[in-house]
Amino acid sequence: MNLASISQSYMSHNENERSIVPYIPPPYHPTAPALAVSASQMETMSLGILNQAMSSSAGASGALKDEKAAFGAVAEALRDPEPIRKIKRQVGIQTLKTLKVELSGMRRKKLILKIIMFICANVTMATSLVGGMSIVDEDIAKHLAFDGKGDWVSKTVHGLNLLCTTMLLAANKISEKVREEIARTKRDIAKRQSYVSAATMSWDGDSVTLLRDVKCGD
């Protein structure tokens, strides 16, 4: 047997071995086709929600104003492209934590102001009552007279009355500003929370699925 016949026999043997190996196709996992949402559908949905946000808010309560702000945030989330939406979502999550901490501090400040106003109001009422009784009752007027031993008592009563009245007015003015800041912060929280929840959802064309998990406020 020559070398050529041996080589040919070896090659045919290898081909037979390779042909015996069965072909195993990769596993197939059937999946439902994804429904693509067109940009026109998103814009139509955004305009519909924006109409709710643009309605008149005259005479509306704080909750209704927060709702309109949430509608505007959802419309903005639907209008933004996907990369911008993801960036805003990440930034909004971090901002929400800071806003909630600030809101807790404002509420504590409001509680302290209420306590100060309560104390000042009671002291003002008491000193005003003593001053009014001194006008009616001559004995009290003698004790609170400016010319005599009751001079320091009268000055103390009138000084406390003036001081507590001033503190009451100042605390009331500061409390109004704090209430406005709380309302504005709650509205900002509602807007960002609505944007984050809207940016997290995936929409398949069904408005019920889209709006089911939207959160508004805390």
Swiss-Prot record:
UniProt xrefs under Pfam families: Orbi_NS3
Transmembrane portions of the chain: none
Function of the molecule: May play a role in the release of virions from infected cells.
Family: Belongs to the orbivirus NS3 family.
Protein name: Non-structural protein NS3
Organism encoding this protein: African horse sickness virus 8 (AHSV-8)
Protein's gene: Segment-10
